[in-house]
Design a protein with these regions (language model features):
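Glycine-rich, N-terminal phosphate-binding loop and its surrounding beta-alpha-beta segment
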Residues: 44-103, 107-109
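Short, conserved charged micro-motifs
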Residues: 32-37, 91-93, 226
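Glycine-rich, charged/polar anion/phosphate-binding loops
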Residues: 7-12, 64-69, 195-205, 224, ...
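N-terminal, positively charged regions that mediate nucleic acid binding
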Residues: 1-58
């Protein structure tokens, strides 16, 4: 399985859901870029589970520990490595997965790919827990891009047929992006957000989960980024 991605920068993700830690190595970051560590932790806290019944009950704090690549809050130019400890694991809850794979998960395909040697606890390397290091990378790159005037943001567009107010197709401001970013439940219309949360809690009480749609926007991107055929926006997403 490839957990490595490389273009202008490279990302290598490591760890498993119930191992000691998970983490990421980011290479080719420009040297001398200021990284506000407190803002980085605030960004990571947005991903961490909430105690409102709408997220996983797993209580991870998602506190990244930077091992290399940052000195005096500035990138040094060498690979930036960070790891995040796993502190709330209940591996016994997954003891039967080697014999009874869950539908909709990677338990079966992972066993086929790795001949049964893969770590099934919590989903192992296939777990949503591995999005935490990706959020770390996004937080780092986001600070670098915002210094150049490029802002990216997202909100929950819909959950179970309940829709939030969409971003404008012609004019989105930095303030629009930052307003949603500061919310515990990232919607533009708080009344619709309350309806979403109620549906999520009801589904959770019944042992179910709900699907949703995210709308993401980037502003102030320079024109002409990418290439035809394989490196346009839709082409890149399709890959």
């Amino acid at each position: 399985m490839s957990s490595f991605w490389s273009r202008n920068i490279s990302l290598s993700i490591f760890g498993e859901s119930h191992g000691p830690a998970i983490g990421i190595v980011i290479d080719n970051l420009p040297p001398g870029e200021y990284i506000d560590v407190e803002k980085l932790r605030q960004f990571m806290a947005r991903r961490a589970p909430k105690k409102d019944g709408t997220t996983t009950p797993r209580g991870e704090k998602d506190l990244p520990q930077i091992m290399s690549g940052l000195l005096n809050d500035r990138t040094t130019g060498v690979p930036l490595c960070a790891f995040i400890q796993n502190t709330d694991t209940r591996s016994k809850d997954y003891s039967n997965l080697a014999r009874l794979p869950r539908p909709g998960h990677a338990d079966y395909t992972g066993a086929m790919r790795y001949r049964g040697f893969n770590d099934v606890r919590g989903g192992g390397h296939f777990s949503g827990r591995l999005t935490a290091p990706l959020c770390f990378a996004g937080a780092v790159c986001g600070q670098i891009l915002e210094r150049r005037g490029i802002y990216t943001g997202a909100h929950i567009a819909s959950v179970h047929g309940i829709s939030d107010d969409a971003f404008s197709r012609t004019k989105v401001t930095k303030e629009d992006i930052l307003e949603v970013r500061g919310k515990d439940f990232p919607v533009r219309n708080d009344a619709q957000g309350e309806k979403m949360k109620e549906d999520i809690r009801n589904a959770s009480q019944g042992g179910e989960s709900l699907g949703g749609i995210i709308e993401c926007v980037t502003i102030n991107m320079p024109a002409g980024v990418g290439s035809p055929i394989f490196e346009g926006l839709e082409n890149t997403i399709a890959q």
